[in-house]
């Protein structure tokens, strides 16, 4: 909660040593002026990042090299990165290389309202995910990026059964992406999106 509600704060923090910090939950929630690069932060010991940039409407700082592999959630197990970028409406960094821990069970509202976000997350580890409900609510990924997500997630190890996934207004292409989506649905996934392009 360190900068939660600090609506005028926008100072550089990239030199901070956060290597022993374990909880960054809602750290910049509603810090609506904050937009600094944090790429040098060592967040490898952080277990909770839920809501970290929730409502940080100007934030588009570089965090592409973060190691989020331990962000699995302690207070709410499995929810370590849920709501992380909710309503962070400027954020659009390439975080496709993040290592997602297989103990993460939820992408709940992770990018809900992050209306600028448009990256390919098809390479993310979704092994443990049992809900991605409202993950991209209000968001439109490009057809290429959304198609790559569907193809990558279907090809990787994933839960079957009633996994809820909201792709926002994103549309998928015919062919491999449509087939991947149909396969996930046949396995029990409940997918909401903008349909085939």
Task: Give the label of every model feature segment.
Residues 1-197:
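Negatively charged
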């Amino acid at each position: 909660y360190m900068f939660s509600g600090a609506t005028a704060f926008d100072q550089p923090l990239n030199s901070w040593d956060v290597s022993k910090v374990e909880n960054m939950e809602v750290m910049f929630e509603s810090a609506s002026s904050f937009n600094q690069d944090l790429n040098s932060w060592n967040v490898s010991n952080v277990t909770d990042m839920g809501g970290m940039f929730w409502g940080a409407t100007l934030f588009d700082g570089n965090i592409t090299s973060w190691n989020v592999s331990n962000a699995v959630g302690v207070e709410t197990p499995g929810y370590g990165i849920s709501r992380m970028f909710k309503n962070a409406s400027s954020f659009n960094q390439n975080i496709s290389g993040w290592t997602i821990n297989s103990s993460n069970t939820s992408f709940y509202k992770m990018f809900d309202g992050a209306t600028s976000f448009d990256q390919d997350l098809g390479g993310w580890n979704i092994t443990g995910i049992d809900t991605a409900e409202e993950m991209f609510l209000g968001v439109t990924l490009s057809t290429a990026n959304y198609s790559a997500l569907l193809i990558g997630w279907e090809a990787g190890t994933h839960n079957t059964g009633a996994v809820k996934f909201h792709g926002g207004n994103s549309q998928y292409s015919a062919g491999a992406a449509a087939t991947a989506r149909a396969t996930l649905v046949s396995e029990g996934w409940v997918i909401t999106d903008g349909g085939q392009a």
